[in-house]
């Protein structure tokens, strides 16, 4: 396997696509530096763009050719609320295999009280006074979300509820 100093920029696109944790050429920071050096301004801006997917988005019924084109062109860096391993995998395949640099998409979802297995809202679980109940629910939610291809979730939410008028108090453990 090729090796290079940490400040080396990979100039060949095919070499950049081969930058995986199993290839000694790259550490994560080296891969990032290499990709950023090759990116156009539009591709860099695309990494800041998070598209709304909708919980049941599938490529066959919901994703338009225009949206796929944006993924191919590097105009989308992440998706919010695309549920299920199949649509995530299909979107990821387009990003990795059909975009210029093969940069993977990030996928995120609100998993405040479950992903596939739905649990009581956090405020209700807190009312049980049993931290193990909450811990078990969050472990199950994390396992389900990560196995479906999600990279990050917006949970658990650990803000202290100081004002009962706050509309998202139900997502916290309360005061």
Enumerate the predicted regions with their spans.
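N-terminal beta-rich core of secreted/periplasmic extracellular enzymes
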Residues: 9-175
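N-terminal Sec signal peptide cleavage junction
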Residues: 1-5
């Amino acid at each position: 396997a090729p090796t290079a100093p940490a400040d080396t920029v990979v100039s060949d696109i095919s070499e950049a696509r081969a930058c995986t944790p199993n290839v000694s050429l790259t550490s994560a920071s080296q891969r990032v530096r290499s990709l950023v050096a090759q990116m156009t301004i539009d591709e860099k801006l695309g990494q800041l763009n998070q598209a709304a997917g909708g919980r049941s988005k599938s490529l066959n019924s919901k994703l338009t050719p225009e949206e796929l084109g944006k993924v191919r062109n590097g105009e989308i860096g992440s998706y919010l609320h695309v549920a299920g391993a199949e649509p995530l995998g299909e979107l990821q395949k387009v990003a990795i295999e059909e975009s210029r640099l093969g940069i993977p998409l990030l996928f995120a979802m609100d998993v405040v009280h479950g992903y596939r297995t739905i649990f009581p809202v956090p405020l209700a679980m807190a009312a049980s006074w049993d931290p193990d109940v909450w811990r078990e629910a969050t472990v199950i939610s994390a396992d389900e979300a990560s196995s479906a291809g999600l990279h990050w979730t917006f949970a658990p939410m650990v803000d202290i509820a100081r004002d009962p008028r706050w509309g998202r108090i139900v997502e916290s453990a309360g005061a």
